[in-house]
């Protein structure tokens, strides 16, 4: 998958988890940009992303993600 394909799929996951069809992701999107994205929803989001992409993040990866761009970078590395 290329970056654009991952972003499209990830956008669908975010829209589903946060029940908001208006969400548009960019590399710089953070939890501050999405009202419903709190610490509890973060757990749901990570689980949904792992399920959608059929992979598991390490704790180091999860704690190190500062924005959507970093999440996409990890997903791209795993897709290789």
Where are the language model's segments positioned?
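Phosphopantetheine-dependent thiolation modules in NRPS/PKS and related acyl-activating systems
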Residues: 2-37, 41-47, 51-80
């Amino acid at each position: 998958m290329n970056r654009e394909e991952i972003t499209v799929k990830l956008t669908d996951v975010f829209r589903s988890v946060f029940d908001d069809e208006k969400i548009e992701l960019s590399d710089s999107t953070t939890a501050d940009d999405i009202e419903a994205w709190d610490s509890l929803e973060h757990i749901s989001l990570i689980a949904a992303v792992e399920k959608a992409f059929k992979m598991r993040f390490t704790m180091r990866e999860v704690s190190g993600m500062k924005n959507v761009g970093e999440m996409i970078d990890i997903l791209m590395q795993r897709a290789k």
